[in-house]
């Protein structure tokens, strides 16, 4: 009997959401994504000890550079066990500074280049702020492809598509968390607000022939994944990938091109900020996500600083 994982792979590219290359080798995804929180967890894995030590060599006390070198080193290890691409994230503390995002993205690409890894195997992850989206628009024109993350609203998705970014990562589980806490409801199936958000974005992109890839992210359970079967890509934690592999039930495709979607929405900065302000969930979860990534970035830098 075919597993749900194999059925899912027939119409969705499966991506591993982890920095643990041993787990990635075990679940065999096409691509992989990392973020500051996952890199912090990876730093505690004994197999990464030498990568941490190597990252601080010749950094001249620049802990930010050491952090970027560690992220790239982890990316290199992951690329040895996947056929596709690695997403490496720009420091979340730069999320509201377009020029700083550009500089850090260029440095990450330069580090990968020095390591012999081509641009065609890397996506630069950037928070979906107005400044981040504008930076991504410039990077795309330079031939550096991007993954816009911490995406919680339709306004963010519309702005990303308009900017021509390569890929977006709309979050499912964190949206579910917010509504469950706010309303006390334990949403299931197609009633899940996170599932509804990604479904709306997917249909909008396909109806308007946007080429931007939709990669659902942040899953709390198998039901959320199953409800988005057919999405371009889904980035899933290794434990949920293994649960899909162990389940031999039938998996029905839920998303496919051809469904009705809303007309194109082109937003200027003022309109983007107003729509974002009107969406309490998206405003709160974006701010919370940036703060959490920033705190974990600081913890990672503290580990590296101790080795400088």
UniProtKB/Swiss-Prot annotation:
Keywords: Cytoplasm, Pentose shunt, Schiff base, Transferase. Its EC number is 2.2.1.2. It comes from the Bacteria. InterPro entries: Aldolase_TIM, TAL/FSA, Transaldolase_1, Transaldolase_AS. GO terms for molecular function: transaldolase activity. The keyword Cytoplasm applies. This is Transaldolase. It comes from Pseudomonas fluorescens (strain Pf0-1). The gene is tal.
């Amino acid at each position: 009997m075919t597993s749900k994982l194999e059925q899912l792979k027939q119409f969705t590219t499966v991506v591993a959401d982890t920095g643990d290359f041993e787990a990635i080798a075990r679940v065999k995804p096409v691509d992989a994504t990392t973020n500051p929180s996952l890199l912090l967890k990876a730093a505690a894995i004994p197999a990464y000890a030498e990568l941490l030590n190597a990252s601080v060599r010749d950094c001249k006390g620049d802990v930010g550079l050491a952090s970027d070198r560690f992220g790239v080193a982890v990316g290199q290890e992951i690329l040895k066990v996947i056929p596709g691409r690695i997403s490496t994230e720009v420091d979340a503390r730069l999320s509201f500074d377009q020029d700083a995002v550009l500089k850090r993205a260029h440095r990450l690409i330069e580090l990968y280049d020095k390591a012999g890894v081509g641009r065609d195997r890397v996506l630069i992850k950037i928070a979906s702020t107005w400044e981040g989206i504008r930076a991504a628009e410039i990077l795309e024109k330079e031939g550096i492809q991007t993954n816009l993350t911490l995406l919680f609203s339709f306004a963010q998705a519309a702005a990303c598509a308009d900017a021509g970014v390569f890929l977006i990562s709309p979050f499912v589980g964190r949206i579910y968390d917010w509504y469950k806490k706010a309303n006390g409801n334990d949403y299931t199936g197609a009633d899940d607000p996170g599932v509804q958000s990604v479904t709306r974005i997917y249909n909008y992109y396909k109806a308007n022939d946007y080429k931007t890839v939709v990669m659902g992210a942040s899953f709390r359970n198998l039901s959320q994944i199953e409800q988005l079967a057919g999405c371009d890509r889904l980035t899933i934690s290794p434990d949920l990938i293994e649960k899909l592999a162990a389940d031999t039930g039938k998996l029905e495709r839920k998303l496919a091109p051809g469904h009705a979607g809303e007309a194109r929405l082109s937003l200027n900065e003022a309109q983007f900020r107003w729509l974002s302000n009107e969406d309490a969930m998206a405003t709160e979860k974006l701010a919370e996500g940036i703060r959490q990534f920033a705190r974990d970035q600081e913890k990672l830098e503290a580990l590296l600083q101790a080795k400088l």
